[in-house]
Curated annotation (Swiss-Prot):
One MF term in the entry's GO annotations: oxidoreductase activity, acting on the CH-OH group of donors, NAD or NADP as acceptor
Disulfide bridge partners, by residue number: none
Binding site for NAD(+): I24, V25, H26, L27, G28, F29, G30, A31, F32, H33, R34, A35
An annotated GO BP: mannitol metabolic process
InterPro entries assigned: 6-PGluconate_DH-like_C_sf (IPR008927), 6PGD_dom2 (IPR013328), Mannitol_DH (IPR000669), Mannitol_DH/Oxidoreductase (IPR050988), Mannitol_DH_C (IPR013118), Mannitol_DH_CS (IPR023027), Mannitol_DH_N (IPR013131), NAD(P)-bd_dom_sf (IPR036291)
EC number: 1.-.-.-
Record family assignment: Belongs to the mannitol dehydrogenase family. UxuB subfamily.
Keyword terms: NAD, Oxidoreductase
Source organism: Escherichia coli (strain K12)
EC top class, as a word: oxidoreductase
Protein name per Swiss-Prot or TrEMBL: Uncharacterized oxidoreductase YdfI
Length: 486
C-alpha cells in the first residue's frame, strides 16, 4: 500500500473490508462521487453493517485518480470543511478501481457482468450523456456516439458501455441491473432511460425491448458542495490526518440525497444514512437545480466578471448576496411544485453554505459547461415566467452574464478560458457578431441551448439585451447592484 491511510488521524473503517460484496459499479470516480455516494455507503457499512461495496470505473480521463486509488488499497479520505472545524473520514467501500486505459475495456465489462451486480450508477456530468440539453434527445450524430453504434462491442461512451454490459448479461441469462444517474439534470433518470433506449434501438431492437422490460432508471437529486481538488486541499488533508492522500477530497458538511425508489435487483438501505426515498424526485430536483444550481451559475458568471475568484468572495459583496437571495425567492421559488419545504429557510441555508470561507469554490469551475446547464437552471424558469406574465429580471441578468462570459474577454481585457462541449458553436456565434445587441441575437440563435421558442420571444430577448448592454456599459458589479433587491 502506497499510503497507510489506516494510520490516519481520521474516522477509520471499523467494518471488515473483506466482508463487502461488490454490488454497485460506479462510472465516474470524480470528487463529487467520492464525497457523496461513497460517504453514504461508508456510513451504512460503519453504522448498519451493510455489505454493499463498489467497483469504481473511469472511462474517459481520470486515469491518475484510479491509479492513486489502486496504490492505496482502494482507500481514500473525505475531509469536511466548515469555517472553524475540519473533520476527516477514511472511506473503505471500494472493492476495486478500474480504468479502460489501464485495465482494458473487457475487464470493465466483465466486472459489470458479475452476477451479483445490482446497480450501475453514474456521475459523468451533463455532457457525458451526449444529449441535447434543449430536447433531452440522444445526439446519435455525435462522432463518439456514432462510432459506438458502428462498433457496439467496443464502446467508449458510458451509454455504449452500459448497453453492451446489458447485452452480455441478457445473452448469459443474467438478470438486468438498475441504472442510476446521479448527475445534476432534471429527471436525470428519464434522461438516462431515453439515451440508453435510443442507443439500444440503433444497435439491436430486441435488446432495446429487453432493456425497456427489465431495467429501471430511478431519478435522483444529489447535493453537496465539493470544490475541485487543489494542491492546497491535499496539503490541508495531510495536515489534518498526518497522511498524504492524492485521492483525497474535501467538501462542506451538508449532504442531501433524494432517490426515486425504483430498483430491479435490490438496493442499499440508503435511508439509514440520511437519504430520502420517494416516489417522485422531480419537485426536489427542480428546487435544487433552480434555487441552488441556478444561483450558483448566476454568481459564477457575474462573480468571475467582477473579479471574484470564489463563491464566498461573492457573498462578501452585499449586492451579490441580495441578488442571489432575490433570484432564489422571487424568481425561482414561484416556479416550484415541491411540497412541505420552507423555501425561505432553504434559501437562507444556501446563502450560509455559499458563505463558508473554507470551501473556496471557484467561480471558473462552476462556470464550466454552461450550454449544458442554462436550460434547467435558468431557462425553464424563464419559460414559466413568460407563461405567467411575471418578472424575471435576475434570470435575464444571469443569461446575459453567461453571454458576457463566453465572449471570452473579462472586464480588464484579459482572455477567459472557456470550457464547454459546445465551444466551437459558441465561438462561431461570438466571432460572427458585433459586440452588443447583435452578439445577444447571435448567441440566442443556438437552438441546442435556447430552443425554438425563446429566441422568438420579444420580451425575453429585450430583457436579456437590456441586461447585457448594462454589463457592457457599467460592468458586472454595478449591474448586479442595480438589479439586486434588499
Amino acid at each position: 500500500m502506497g499510503n497507510n491511510l489506516l494510520s490516519a488521524k481520521a474516522t477509520l473503517p471499523v467494518y471488515d473490508l473483506n466482508n463487502l460484496a461488490p454490488r454497485i459499479v460506479h462510472l465516474g470516480f470524480g470528487a463529487f462521487h467520492r464525497a457523496h455516494q461513497g460517504v453514504y455507503a461508508d456510513i451504512l457499512a460503519t453504522e448498519h453493517f451493510s455489505d454493499w461495496g463498489y467497483y469504481e470505473v473511469n472511462l474517459i480521463g481520470g486515469e491518475q485518480q484510479i491509479a492513486d486509488l489502486q496504490q492505496q488499497d482502494n482507500l481514500y479520505t473525505v475531509a469536511e470543511m466548515s469555517a472553524d472545524v475540519w473533520t476527516a473520514r477514511v472511506v473503505g467501500v471500494v472493492k476495486k478501481a478500474l480504468h479502460v486505459q489501464i485495465d482494458g475495456l473487457e475487464t470493465v465489462l466483465a466486472a459489470m457482468c458479475e452476477p451479483q451486480i445490482a446497480i450501475v450508477s453514474l456521475t459523468i456530468t451533463e455532457k457525458g450523456y451526449f444529449h441535447s440539453p434543449a430536447t433531452g434527445q440522444l445526439m446519435l450524430d455525435h462522432p463518439m456516439v456514432a462510432a459506438d453504434v458502428q462498433n457496439p462491442h467496443q464502446p467508449k461512451t458510458a451509454t455504449g458501455v452500459i448497453v453492451e454490459a446489458l447485452a452480455r448479461r441478457k445473452a448469459a441469462g443474467l438478470p438486468a441491473f438498475t441504472v442510476m444517474s446521479c448527475d445534476n439534470m432534471p429527471e436525470n433518470g428519464h434522461v438516462m432511460r431515453d439515451v440508453v433506449t435510443s442507443y439500444a434501438q440503433a444497435v439491436d431492437v430486441k435488446l432495446a425491448q429487453w432493456i425497456e422490460d427489465n431495467v429501471t432508471f430511478p431519478s435522483t437529486m444529489v447535493d453537496r458542495i465539493v470544490p475541485a481538488v487543489t494542491e492546497d486541499t491535499l496539503a490541508k488533508i495531510e495536515q489534518l490526518t498526518g497522511v498524504r492522500d492524492p485521492a483525497g477530497v474535501a467538501c462542506e458538511p451538508f449532504r442531501q440525497w433524494v432517490i426515486e425508489d425504483n430498483f430491479v435487483a435490490g438496493r442499499p438501505e440508503w435511508e439509514k444514512a440520511g437519504a430520502e426515498l420517494v416516489s417522485d424526485v422531480l419537485p426536489y430536483e427542480e428546487m435544487k437545480l433552480r434555487m441552488l444550481n441556478g444561483s450558483h451559475s448566476f454568481l459564477a458568471y457575474l462573480g468571475y466578471l467582477a473579479g471574484y475568484q470564489h463563491i464566498n468572495d461573492c457573498m462578501e459583496d452585499e449586492h451579490y448576496r441580495y441578488a442571489a437571495y432575490g433570484l432564489m425567492l422571487q424568481e425561482q421559488a414561484p416556479t416550484l411544485k415541491v411540497q412541505g419545504v420552507d423555501l425561505q429557510d432553504y434559501a437562507n441555508r444556501l446563502i450560509a453554505r455559499y458563505s463558508n470561507p473554507a470551501l473556496r469554490h471557484r467561480t471558473w469551475q462552476i462556470a464550466m459547461d454552461g450550454s449544458q446547464k442554462l436550460p434547467q437552471r435558468m431557462l425553464d424558469s424563464v419559460r414559466w415566467h413568460l407563461a405567467h406574465d411575471s418578472k424575471f429580471d435576475l434570470l435575464a441578468l444571469g443569461v446575459a452574464g453567461w453571454m458576457r462570459y463566453v465572449g471570452g474577454v473579462d472586464e480588464q481585457g484579459n482572455p477567459i478560458e472557456i470550457s464547454d462541449p459546445l465551444l466551437p458553436v459558441i465561438q462561431k456565434a461570438v466571432q460572427s457578431s458585433a459586440e452588443g445587441k447583435a452578439r445577444v441575437q447571435s448567441l440566442l440563435a443556438i437552438k441546442a441551448i435556447f430552443g425554438d421558442d425563446l429566441p422568438d420571444n420579444s420580451l425575453f430577448t429585450a430583457r436579456v439585451t437590456e441586461t447585457y448592454l448594462s454589463l457592457l456599459a457599467h460592468g458586472a458589479k454595478a449591474t448586479v447592484a442595480k438589479y439586486s433587491v434588499k
